[in-house]
Structures are given as C-alpha cells and as structure tokens.
C-alpha cells in the first residue's frame, strides 16, 4: 500500500543532532562509523537543495538548547524535523514535550541499531509520537528520513 503524500510541498526541514554527535568520526568508530557530523550535514544540505528544500541543522550537547531550538522551529516555518536525540532518547521528557508542543512532524534517527545494544537503549521517549524511527543504517538513515519527509509532502 502506498503512503499518501501530504497536500503541500515541503520547503523547510530542521535536522537536530543530540549530545556527543559532534564527536562522530572519532568516537567509537566501530559503532558509529568514520563519517563526521560535518560530512552528514553536507550530504543532507546537498540532497535537500537538489530536491528544492531548505535544510537547517543544529547540534548541541545541552538538552535546554535543543528544546529552545525546537521551540524556535515553529515560528521559523519549519515543516518537518529529523532528530537524532542520541542519549536523550532514553531520558528526555523535555524533548518529547517540546516536540509535542510545536506539533511539527518528526522522524527519529539513530546511526546504530539501538535494539542490538544495551537494554537501556531500547526505550525511546520520542518514538511513539514520531512519524517513524530509523536505526542501524548509519549516516544514510538521515538521508532516508529526508527523502521520506520530502516524498510524503509531494516533493
């Protein structure tokens, strides 16, 4: 069964990267790979631009900064959020409430397959409200999320 596109074309996407993702490329490369956060952001901007979409990205190691960025997204006209909450996946009611408060659809992305890792990583405070969750595809999971978001908006 084909998914039904949402009526209007998507124009503005925000990608949020949570704590420690600034260390990609050097932190546990056997788990997260050698690709850096800058590489991921470049690939996302290139893909979005090629598809006629404006993409902003933001990384923080601080929960409050991520919450503030989510709040700002609403007034900026952000229509879709792709978020890798990283460790906040398993702890942050604040991120969950911020996403619910702005009522912007989102996809949760994880580089590793969190279900093949420690049991505490198996629970997400964000997943049940997300459009979808992508995990275990490495940095390409971000591109899959972006393509899905654009395709669902008739782009």
From Swiss-Prot:
CDD domains for this protein: DHQase_II
Keyword Iron-sulfur: no
Pathway stated in the Swiss-Prot or TrEMBL entry: Metabolic intermediate biosynthesis; chorismate biosynthesis; chorismate from D-erythrose 4-phosphate and phosphoenolpyruvate: step 3/7
List of catalytic residues: 32 (proton acceptor), 110 (proton donor)
Keyword Metal-binding: no
Pfam families: DHquinase_II
Recorded superkingdom: Bacteria
GO biological process, one term: amino acid biosynthetic process
Annotated keywords: Amino-acid biosynthesis, Aromatic amino acid biosynthesis, Lyase
SUPFAM superfamilies: Type II 3-dehydroquinate dehydratase
Sequence positions that bind substrate: 84, 90, 97, 111-112, 121
Enzyme Commission numbers on file: 4.2.1.10
GO molecular function, one term: 3-dehydroquinate dehydratase activity
Annotated positions for site Transition state stabilizer: 27
InterPro entries found in the cross-reference section: DHquinase_II, DHquinase_II_CS, DHquinase_II_sf
Reactions the enzyme catalyzes: 3-dehydroquinate = 3-dehydroshikimate + H2O
Functional description taken from the UniProt entry: Catalyzes a trans-dehydration via an enolate intermediate.
Family per similarity comment: Belongs to the type-II 3-dehydroquinase family.
Subunit description: Homododecamer.
Name recorded for this polypeptide: 3-dehydroquinate dehydratase
Source organism: Ralstonia pickettii (strain 12J)
Gene: aroQ
């Amino acid at each position: 069964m084909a998914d039904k596109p949402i009526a209007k074309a998507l124009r503005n996407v925000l990608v949020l990267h949570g704590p420690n993702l600034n260390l990609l490329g050097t932190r546990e490369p056997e788990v997260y790979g050698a690709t850096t956060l800058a590489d991921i952001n470049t690939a996302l901007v290139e893909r979005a631009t090629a598809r006629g979409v404006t993409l902003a990205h933001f990384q923080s190691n601080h929960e409050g900064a991520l919450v503030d960025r989510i709040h700002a997204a609403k007034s900026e006209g952000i229509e879709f959020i792709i978020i890798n909450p990283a460790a906040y996946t398993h702890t942050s009611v604040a991120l969950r409430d911020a996403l619910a408060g702005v009522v912007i659809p989102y996809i949760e992305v994880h580089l590793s397959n969190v279900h093949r890792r420690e049991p505490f990583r198996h629970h997400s405070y964000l997943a049940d409200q997300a459009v979808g969750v992508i995990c275990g595809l490495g940095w390409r999971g971000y591109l899959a999320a972006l393509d899905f978001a654009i395709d669902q908006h008739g782009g």
